[in-house]
Amino acid sequence: MGKYFGTDGVRGEANVELTPELAFKLGRFGGYVLSQHETGRPKVFVARDTRISGEMLESALVAGLLSVGIEVYKLGVLATPGVSYLVRTENASAGVMISASHNPALDNGIKFFGGDGFKLDDAREAEIEALLDAAEDTLPRPSAEGLGTLVDYPEGLRKYEKFLVTTGLDLGGMKVALDAANGAAAVSARNIFLDLNAEIAVIGDQPDGLNINAGVGSTHPEQLQALVRESGSAIGLAFDGDSDRLIAVDENGDIVDGDKVMYIIGKYLSQKGELAKNTIVTTVMSNLGFHKALDREGINKAVTAVGDRYVVEEMRKNGYNLGGEQSGHVIIMDYNTTGDGQLTAIQLTKVMVETGKSLSELAAEVTIYPQKLVNIRVENSMKDKAMDVPAIAAIIEKMEAEMAGNGRILVRPSGTEPLLRVMAEAPTDDEVNYYVDTIADVVRAEIGLD
């Protein structure tokens, strides 16, 4: 990660940290870097979610791009994966998404995609950061025909919707409950599932600029659970603010998280011989029950660090086509290059139609183990050295021996804070509490600050 670019672009409180001035510079410097690696005038797609700050930042970003001669196509409100899709299929040089995903309305972010639809590579981000840190802006200032042009491109949304519909099956009147998180999916999810011949009930589709992710969406599925029960829906589908993740709800109103969604889609692809290398890419935070279910099906796993960027890196490196996270980021590389909540939702309903099984039946094959996570404050200098402390290493070894393979312990440093995270999974709540609390007590005694 750089000074400005984190794992998911540049983020911060809108108009405080992520200011119009910074957005202008990101557009200007980002556009210039793109132009240095292109022949001809670069073409860039720009989209945003529904945050009140989106239009402010969009205006500044677009002005910056135009100031260095970029041809800008303004997509309006669109899901992050929609930008990725359009960049690839319409031969754009890059795409920019203005969103802070599942964060509250006061935050926003700016994320660049390369012409291949993947996140802009680290080398390009470093070039942009170097310009941001320069003492003065010495870039060319073209005039007249050298300036960029702006094209409003609302048809991009419908092209993305049509693409998504082609990946699904006729749902034959299936009752589907949707939660668009008052975000980007509010402009598309309804249309997509109506085109798939679903009978729909919708919440979270009235964005006002301030209510994105507020009590709705994939991080707050409670309203959707109630809607599924009240409406008698066969499935509930909750997206986040930029629709790059999905949390599902079965017909009983129970949560079906990213692990279960990946298992259901992965098993379906495996049985059809379409799961690349018969492998699913997941992170160290995936539940042990998910791993055991894959083992029963003979499906392989590739495990990465936490973060969808690491999942995507592993998929690209080894040619895998399915991966994701427990949080609902699911990447189906046969169709798109990034997590896509609406695409994942369509594939989930496709499995239901083709198997004739309810979502609860499909999800029941994964027994989710109780999981507990405790954060312990430590010195930054110690969080990467915890396993070098003999007492900590010994207690972890002792607890793992007691588990005898029927549980899991993960002790890892936070990537951004002076914290050590202690996580365990076991068959019962009592067991998981015992394992985590025992290890946490030793960690606190040896290196804890509290």
Swiss-Prot record:
Record Pfam families: PGM_PMM_I, PGM_PMM_II, PGM_PMM_III, PGM_PMM_IV
InterPro entries linked to this entry: A-D-PHexomutase_a/b/a-I, A-D-PHexomutase_a/b/a-I/II/III, A-D-PHexomutase_a/b/a-II, A-D-PHexomutase_a/b/a-III, A-D-PHexomutase_C, A-D-PHexomutase_C_sf, A-D-PHexomutase_CS, Alpha-D-phosphohexomutase_SF
Annotated keywords: Isomerase, Magnesium, Metal-binding, Phosphoprotein
Protein modification: Activated by phosphorylation.
Catalytic residues (UniProt): S101
Cofactor: how bound: Binds 1 Mg(2+) ion per subunit.
Record bears the keyword NADP: no
Domain of life: Bacteria
GO MF annotation list: magnesium ion binding; phosphoglucosamine mutase activity; phosphomannomutase activity
Binding residue positions for Mg(2+): S101, D240, D242, D244
GO cellular component, one term: cytosol
UniProt-listed SUPFAM superfamilies: Phosphoglucomutase, C-terminal domain (SSF55957), Phosphoglucomutase, first 3 domains (SSF53738)
EC number from the UniProt entry: 5.4.2.10
GO terms of biological process kind: carbohydrate metabolic process; peptidoglycan biosynthetic process; UDP-N-acetylglucosamine biosynthetic process
Described function: Catalyzes the conversion of glucosamine-6-phosphate to glucosamine-1-phosphate.
Similarity comment: Belongs to the phosphohexose mutase family.
Full protein name: Phosphoglucosamine mutase
